[in-house]
Amino acid sequence: MTISTPVIIDSLIRHAQRTPEQTALLCGDQHWNYRQLVTRAHVMASALRQAGLSGQAILLNLPKSLDAVAAIYATWLSGNHYIPIDYSQPSSRIERIIAAAAPALIIDTAWLATLDSQPSFDAEQPVGRMVYHNPIAAILYTSGSTGTPKGVQISHEMLGFFIQWAVRDTQLTARDVLSNHASFAFDLSTFDLFASAYVGAATWIIRESEQKDCAALAQGLQRHAVSVWYSVPSILAMLEKSTLLNPTLGQSLRQVIFAGEPYPVTALKRLLPCLPQPCRVSNWYGPTETNVCVAYAIDRARLAMLKQVPIGLPLEGLTAQLEDENGDRHPLTAQLRLSGELLISGPCVTPGYSNVVVPRQAALHPHQCHATGDWVEMTPEGLVFRGRIDDMVKINGYRVELGEIESVLHQHPAIDRAALCVELGDLRQTLIMVISLQTGAVPPGLLELKQFLQQKLPSYMIPNKLVITESLPVNANGKVDRKQLAGVVAV
């Protein structure tokens, strides 16, 4: 299915015309209805058009706010695309992204102040549809292997395909209230913002200061009667550990979705009793280059039999293949235990990168195919993530998938989170376990953990060192930061 019209912006404007008083956004003590949101976006778009900007990259260096959302739509209404910046990240990385992106304009708080001081931009501008020419909706910057952030182009076709699938999968309606926990620079935010705009629902924008504040999250969840929650697993685990989340507080929840990293089965089992019984729980998978491309609905009854939460099966309309160690590609079939790098084809795939050349991807993307770099295995429950190809190391001549060891470690009752790193020696590499503990748990020793792992893994996959830390370092998206992990080990 090819989507040639900007379905999201058309839907947004339609809601502003038909249900102008419907709540669109909630943030702190502020809220906007759909007319207010579209009117503000038009004011910004008028300024961009008067500046002669069309088909350009507009960088958004703003904290999460109502204005930040309006700025996103303003870039589309003026025929441009947006580049969101995670406002909480170090200034040095922001500078690297700005240098790599070379935007035509930066919208920041100073730009907004100037805009508001100019009476020529009428706040009561009529709501209407703008002519649309730019096929690119956004450029999202992710970490690059060279140290230079990598700009992933997000097309309107990609967004339209994903949002229409997500709305069907979650049975989203205008009565829903979605939570937006992710930074606007993270691809998870595209569901929160654009699925709600597509159906006319409301979105609670969780500000940077609230993102790791369990009390603020619990209060907002209840206050706004959030019905659809979407975040990385570590945030859900944090809420569960706080003991603030329970079926009564979260009684409005009907969908809880996690993505971005594996959710250990043991941790997920602890989360489920905190949710209302009818609440559907899903695992969505996909790199920025495809957004969500594989999904799995959690079966509470079957969860007890699983060692790892599957990522599931490709979305309808997409094709998945597994490329084995020999470079041979295999279609997904009923053949179990087939493993390889996951390749995804279809309208969800990025057109390419904005500022770098990734040789293998550059060859695949024109054919709407993306090599994810993730090693997966086909099981009766669907695809299971086994680890990043980048995280596969050779130990004594054996290929070792760090993710497989981490998955087993997460089954230990004392462990909250676990990650592996490799210490390079003159003659050999040493595997090191880095773990954080469950509240009140007795710290396990190295021997105990080695014996635990030996029950499920071959001897060459057993780490020889252990580091226990209060918490594992995470990046801005809530995922374990492996570069910082090496620093924890070195201390």
UniProtKB/Swiss-Prot annotation:
<keyword id="KW-0045">Antibiotic biosynthesis</keyword>
<dbReference type="Pfam" id="PF13193">
    <property type="entry name" value="AMP-binding_C"/>
</dbReference>
<dbReference type="GO" id="GO:0005737">
    <property type="term" value="C:cytoplasm"/>
</dbReference>
<dbReference type="Pfam" id="PF00501">
    <property type="entry name" value="AMP-binding"/>
</dbReference>
<dbReference type="GO" id="GO:0031177">
    <property type="term" value="F:phosphopantetheine binding"/>
</dbReference>
<dbReference type="InterPro" id="IPR020845">
    <property type="entry name" value="AMP-binding_CS"/>
</dbReference>
<dbReference type="InterPro" id="IPR000873">
    <property type="entry name" value="AMP-dep_synth/lig_dom"/>
</dbReference>
<dbReference type="GO" id="GO:0005524">
    <property type="term" value="F:ATP binding"/>
</dbReference>
<dbReference type="GO" id="GO:0043041">
    <property type="term" value="P:amino acid activation for nonribosomal peptide biosynthetic process"/>
</dbReference>
<comment type="similarity">
    <text>Belongs to the ATP-dependent AMP-binding enzyme family.</text>
</comment>
<dbReference type="InterPro" id="IPR045851">
    <property type="entry name" value="AMP-bd_C_sf"/>
</dbReference>
<keyword id="KW-0067">ATP-binding</keyword>
<comment type="pathway">
    <text>Antibiotic biosynthesis; prodigiosin biosynthesis.</text>
</comment>
<keyword id="KW-0436">Ligase</keyword>
<comment type="function">
    <text>Involved in the biosynthesis of 4-methoxy-2,2'-bipyrrole-5-carbaldehyde (MBC), one of the terminal products involved in the biosynthesis of the red antibiotic prodigiosin (Pig). Catalyzes the conversion of L-proline to L-prolyl-AMP and the transfer of the L-prolyl group to acyl carrier protein PigG.</text>
</comment>
<protein>
    <recommendedName>
        <fullName>L-proline--[L-prolyl-carrier protein] ligase</fullName>
        <ecNumber>6.2.1.53</ecNumber>
    </recommendedName>
</protein>
<dbReference type="GO" id="GO:0017000">
    <property type="term" value="P:antibiotic biosynthetic process"/>
</dbReference>
<dbReference type="InterPro" id="IPR042099">
    <property type="entry name" value="ANL_N_sf"/>
</dbReference>
<dbReference type="GO" id="GO:0044550">
    <property type="term" value="P:secondary metabolite biosynthetic process"/>
</dbReference>
<dbReference type="GO" id="GO:0016874">
    <property type="term" value="F:ligase activity"/>
</dbReference>
<keyword id="KW-0547">Nucleotide-binding</keyword>
<dbReference type="InterPro" id="IPR025110">
    <property type="entry name" value="AMP-bd_C"/>
</dbReference>
